[in-house]
């Protein structure tokens, strides 16, 4: 969750009232924040606020928090009103950017009076929105420039990698390629554009570079100080809806500082738009739904009043229906439940009387979990040690290192690391990885795991099913197929289940020393001696025998 710093005095200046630290601890709850830390520096009190909502970037700065609190306290109500004036600024977007970084939206904000606190909040908000909402600048990157140094019209264009400009914080020109290699921000975010045929560049009519989205601003225009009065805001990314929202968050925060927002015309190859668009969004809600889910006997007028304290404009359509309008810097309203949450925040969770749940039954353990625990106890009784490995894995671990062809598995869309890019289909690779990481320990090593494997199942709503499995691996000199079968025999005998082993072929096991495990004629697992190639892949120097079975067919 985003955390950000604010000065107590700055918050109070924006709210228009002073409060004690203890009072602030309660007030920030209206802005879906918690007071994480308090400290004093240079005679000022500072707060570290911990936002509890990743879908509300408008609440990640002093301006947004103060605005929310003003409304919650009744100092203002209904929709916030921001006057947006026309300007003659035009930005032209190059069609070559379509598959590089296609969307840019812009605004001008004039008449700012930025002190150190205001400037700090602007920079912090810019970074937090790009980091969290913008997924580390992949989907949203923000640039803010001294507009007095910019000569419109402006061009968002594709540039050759050999073009040069002076990046922020430097005094000498660098090529775009050099910026990716040498500049701190280039090394951090260069992967977002490095493999593209061109790099994005924002330049004015005189050819002066404003920025290289999403990497770095220029030293000429990209340094905003307390002397800056007028700014040009640039937001780029892949999703027009997301970049529009980010722009709205930034410009309305600046408007809270007294800035005057001006529109910019953005001309794309096949359409044009004017930004920012602060037109309120609309949604219909049911009063009865709000009463039912909240458990509160609120009248329609009371619900209307609570919503107006959360920056909604409410039009009652009937006894049970209302049309609500909410600010353009929000994009988190998708269901009446989202509106209900705001009703409860305004009402105050602490004002809701707790009730003891009326349960018709007594709680008890899940019988299948008891069965899994019994399996664990048996394995420990057989002299095995339990390990617990991660469900997240990779195709390399699941297939390549196990010497088998790649199959379809559940993959993560945007993994942080390729090592954790999929959900495992079977447990044995995890045990092999464990053995590989413990080759320095004494042998024999006898381990097992009871865990979930995730399989593709097109018949289900989620297209997947998670199946509980048992995997056993024995590592040490002298271990053979017989040793693994002895443990399997003992397990089945304790469970009172008859089973058969039928010879099969499997790339992870030695041919002729591998079999599929059958119960009632259905395959439930596999057993065998691990193939030498697999041992080599995992850098294991001793024989390994193993088996893996589904547990649900054994649950009687």
Curated annotation (Swiss-Prot):
Residues that, per the record, bind Mg(2+):
332, 338, 341-342
Q: Which GO molecular function annotations are given, in alphabetical order?
A: ATP binding; magnesium ion binding; phenylalanine-tRNA ligase activity; RNA binding
Q: List, alphabetically, the PROSITE patterns matched.
A: B5
**What is the reaction catalyzed?**
tRNA(Phe) + L-phenylalanine + ATP = L-phenylalanyl-tRNA(Phe) + AMP + diphosphate + H(+)
The residues covered by the B5 domain are 278-354
- InterPro entries registered for this protein in UniProt: aa-tRNA-synth_II/BPL/LPL (IPR045864), B3/B4_tRNA-bd (IPR005146), DNA-bd_dom_put_sf (IPR009061), Phe-tRNA-ligase_IIc_bsu (IPR045060), Phe-tRNA-synth_IIc_bsu_arc_euk (IPR004531), Phe-tRNA_synthase-like_B3/B4 (IPR020825), Phe_tRNA_ligase_beta2_arc (IPR022918), PheRS_beta_core (IPR041616)
Q: Which domain of life is it from?
A: Archaea
Question: Which keywords fit this entry according to its UniProt record?
Answer: Aminoacyl-tRNA synthetase, ATP-binding, Cytoplasm, Ligase, Magnesium, Metal-binding, Nucleotide-binding, Protein biosynthesis
Task: List required co-factors.
Answer: Mg(2+)
Q: How does it assemble?
A: Tetramer of two alpha and two beta subunits.
Give the protein's recorded name: Phenylalanine--tRNA ligase beta subunit
Task: Please name the source species.
Answer: Pyrococcus furiosus (strain ATCC 43587 / DSM 3638 / JCM 8422 / Vc1)
Write the gene name: pheT
């Amino acid at each position: 969750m985003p955390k950000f710093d604010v000065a107590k005095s700055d918050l109070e200046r924006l709210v228009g009232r002073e409060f004690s630290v203890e009072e602030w601890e309660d007030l920030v709850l209206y802005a879906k924040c918690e007071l994480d830390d308090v400290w004093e520096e240079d005679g000022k009190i500072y707060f570290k606020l911990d936002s509890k909502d990743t879908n509300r970037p408008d609440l990640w700065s002093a301006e947004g928090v103060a605005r929310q609190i003003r409304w919650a306290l009744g100092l203002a109500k209904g929709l916030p009103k921001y006057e947006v004036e026309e300007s003659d600024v035009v930005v032209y977007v190059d069609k070559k950017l379509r598959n590089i970084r296609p969307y840019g939206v812009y605004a001008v904000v004039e008449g700012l009076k930025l002190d150190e606190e205001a400037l700090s909040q602007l920079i912090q908000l810019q970074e937090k929105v790009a980091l969290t909402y913008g997924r580390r600048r992949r989907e949203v990157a923000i640039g803010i420039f001294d507009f007095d140094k910019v000569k419109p019209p402006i061009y968002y264009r594709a540039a050759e990698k050999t073009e040069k400009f002076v990046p922020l914080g430097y005094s000498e020109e660098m090529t775009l390629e050099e910026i990716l290699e040498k500049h701190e921000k280039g090394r951090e975010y260069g992967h977002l554009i490095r493999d593209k045929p061109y790099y994005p560049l924002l330049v004015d009519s005189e050819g002066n570079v404003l920025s290289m989205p999403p990497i770095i601003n220029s030293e000429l225009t990209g340094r905003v100080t307390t002397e800056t009065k007028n700014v040009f805001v640039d937001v780029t990314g892949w999703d027009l809806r997301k970049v529009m929202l980010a722009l709205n968050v930034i410009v309305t925060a600046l408007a809270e500082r007294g800035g005057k927002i001006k529109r910019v015309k953005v001309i794309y190859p096949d359409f044009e738009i004017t930004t920012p668009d602060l037109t309120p969004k609309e949604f219909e809600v049911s009063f009865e739904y709000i009463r039912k889910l909240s458990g509160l006997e609120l009248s329609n007028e009371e619900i209307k009043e609570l919503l107006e304290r959360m920056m909604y404009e409410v039009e009652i359509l009937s006894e049970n229906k209302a049309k609500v309008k909410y600010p353009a810097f929000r994009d988190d309203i998708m269901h009446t439940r989202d509106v209900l949450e705001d009703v409860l925040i305004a009402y105050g969770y602490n004002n809701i009387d707790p009730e003891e749940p009326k349960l018709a039954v007594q709680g008890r353990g899940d019988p299948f979990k008891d069965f899994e625990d019994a399996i664990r106890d048996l394995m420990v009784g057989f002299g095995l040690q339990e390990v617990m490995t991660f469900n997240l894995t990779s195709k390399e671990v699941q297939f390549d290192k196990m010497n088998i062809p790649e199959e379809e598995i559940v993959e993560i869309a945007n993994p942080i690391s390729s090592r954790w890019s999929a959900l495992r289909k079977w447990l044995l690779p995890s045990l092999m990885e464990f053995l590989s990481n413990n080759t320095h320990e004494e042998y024999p090593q006898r381990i097992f795991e009871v865990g979930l494997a995730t399989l593709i199942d097109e018949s289900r709503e989620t297209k997947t099913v998670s199946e509980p499995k048992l995997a056993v691996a024995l590592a040490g000199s002298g271990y053979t197929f017989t040793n693994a079968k002895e443990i399997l025999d003992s397990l089945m005998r304790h469970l009172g289940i008859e089973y058969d082993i039928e010879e099969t072929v499997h790339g992870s096991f030695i041919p002729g020393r591998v079999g599929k495990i059958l119960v009632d004629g259905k395959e439930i697992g596999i057993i065998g001696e691990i193939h030498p190639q697999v041992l080599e892949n995992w850098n294991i120097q001793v024989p390994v025998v193993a088996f893996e079975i589904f547990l649900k067919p054994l649950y009687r």
